[in-house]
Amino acid sequence: MDRYDLFEVAAARREARALPYAGALTPVEAYQLLSEGSAVIVDVRTRPEWEFVGHVEDAPLIEWKSYGAPHPDPAFVDKLAARFPKDAAILLLCRSGVRSHHAATAAAQAGFTRVYNVLEGFEGDQDEEGRRGTLGGWRHAGLPWTQH
């Protein structure tokens, strides 16, 4: 699939799921767009997750919520806008796709026109034993990542 097809698939998911942002992509689709230089990826997890669990190489960290914080960072959208134009294709990634959904919603409400959620996130959903990394996600898909 080329980038135009991938963006169309993401938009079709937006329509099917009534998403308030440009669309949603699987980790493999997101990686293809990154590899082609058609989009940027932003990690919205907490700094401890980014440092200790691992992250997509060269993905900037802009926390949606800081570790232990009960509410999203009120400056999240401003931090995103300080790094990227509002018409950039931005892929948001969290642990399982939930926080990045909320971050994408906030970004779209602030005028970002091409913000996408990466479904399944970095680690995916929990399996029957409560573990992550076995049911989807960036790492489970075998995509490149790093850990410091």
Model-inferred region functions:
Residues 43, 97:
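Conserved G/P- and acidic residue-centered "switch" motifs that form tight phosphate/ATP-binding loops
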Residues 1-39, 47-89, 100-148:
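Rhodanese-like catalytic fold shared by cysteine-dependent sulfurtransferases
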Residues 92-93:
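Short, surface-exposed ligand- or partner-binding patches at beta-edge/loop junctions that are enriched
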